[in-house]
């Protein structure tokens, strides 16, 4: 019997492919407003500080390809065909949906490479995909809202956290704290009943409990540069506060809201948070990001198959 064909729409934030893309990329993020020359220069310096344009573009594509392969390897009923759709740079979400339609794909399942639901992120991706599909008259898209508590996803982080704690002396472990974080969003989402903060708290609790970590805290990072209040505490402030109030001398940063090595992790954690730990005379740790690790890819595949009940 012929396999049923299904689109696999993998959506992500996107990143500049080369330095010349930085301005148009950030102009898109800023809803068509060009960044000032100062802001643009600051962004270029940040990319320079992490060794050049972030590897995110290559990693995202690799994650998507590996997910397609894994899904086709572990079941025989459906042949998945992957389409990559990005939020702020080509191929845009709409481009991917259009391509599916042109390829005759009637049904698709979509997953966003971010574990926690929010109206700002997951919902906006899903709405863009569905709006384009509706305009074209197909495909039907089965969206995934969240996978923040998927056991295999939690297990990936538990393993990485345990490795870090195992590298410490008993004395260091006693004064170590795990900081679990995600990208901050404007505070107004709370008033709207957005589950984003609650889902991050759930992920943090699951990881800490399963890894046997006594001391942990939830923080936010990479807040936007706008006048409105953003979710806090910021991870840098939290680091200083925990050191001052609790006397922690080792900090293990787990930016679970992200799934790859990119600017927010390589700069905001590995440079900015590390600078704070150096200022207060503490140790800095940051377990490796999921990227295209087979265990992480398997977690995503499990999430997709659960959504279409295979």
UniProtKB/Swiss-Prot annotation:
Keywords: Cytoplasm, Heme biosynthesis, Iron, Lyase, Metal-binding, Porphyrin biosynthesis
Pathway: Porphyrin-containing compound metabolism; protoheme biosynthesis
Domain of life: Bacteria
Gene Ontology, cellular component aspect: cytoplasm
Catalytic activity: Fe-coproporphyrin III + 2 H(+) = coproporphyrin III + Fe(2+)
Residues that hold Fe-coproporphyrin III according to the record: 13, 30, 46-47, 54, 125
Keyword Iron appears in the UniProt entry: yes
Molecular-function GO terms, alphabetical: ferrochelatase activity; metal ion binding
Residue numbers binding Fe(2+): 183, 264
EC number per UniProt: 4.99.1.9
Compartmental location: Cytoplasm
GO biological process, one term: heme biosynthetic process
Function: Involved in coproporphyrin-dependent heme b biosynthesis. Catalyzes the insertion of ferrous iron into coproporphyrin III to form Fe-coproporphyrin III.
Family: Belongs to the ferrochelatase family.
Full protein name: Coproporphyrin III ferrochelatase
Biological source species: Geobacillus sp. (strain WCH70)
């Amino acid at each position: 019997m012929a396999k049923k064909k299904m689109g696999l729409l993998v959506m992500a934030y996107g990143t500049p492919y080369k330095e010349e893309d930085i301005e148009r990329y950030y102009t898109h993020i800023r809803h068509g407003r060009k960044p000032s020359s100062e802001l643009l220069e600051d962004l270029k310096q940040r990319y320079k500080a992490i060794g050049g344009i972030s590897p995110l573009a290559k990693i995202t594509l690799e994650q998507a390809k590996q997910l397609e392969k894994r899904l086709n390897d572990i079941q025989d009923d459906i042949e998945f065909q992957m389409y990559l759709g990005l939020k702020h740079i080509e191929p845009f979400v709409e481009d991917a949906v259009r391509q599916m339609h042109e390829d005759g794909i009637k049904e698709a399942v979509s997953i966003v490479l971010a574990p926690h639901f929010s109206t700002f992120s997951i919902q906006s991706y899903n709405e863009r995909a569905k709006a384009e599909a509706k305009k074209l008259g197909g495909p039907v898209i089965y969206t995934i809202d969240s996978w923040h508590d998927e056991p295999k996803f939690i297990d990936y982080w538990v393993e990485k956290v345990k490795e870090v704690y195992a590298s410490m002396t008993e004395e260091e472990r006693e004064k170590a704290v795990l900081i679990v974080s995600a990208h901050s969003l404007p505070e107004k989402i709370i008033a709207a009943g957005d589950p984003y903060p609650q889902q991050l708290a759930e992920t943090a609790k699951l990881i800490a409990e399963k890894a046997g970590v006594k001391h942990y805290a939830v923080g936010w990072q990479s807040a936007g540069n706008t006048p409105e209040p953003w979710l806090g505490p910021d991870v840098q402030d939290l680091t200083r506060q925990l050191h001052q109030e609790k006397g922690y001398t080792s900090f293990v940063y787990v930016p679970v809201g992200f799934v790859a090595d990119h600017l927010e992790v390589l700069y905001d954690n590995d440079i900015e948070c590390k600078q704070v730990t150096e200022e207060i005379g503490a140790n800095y740790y940051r377990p490796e990001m999921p990227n295209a690790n087979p265990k992480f890819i398997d977690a995503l595949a499990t999430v997709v198959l659960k959504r279409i009940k295979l």
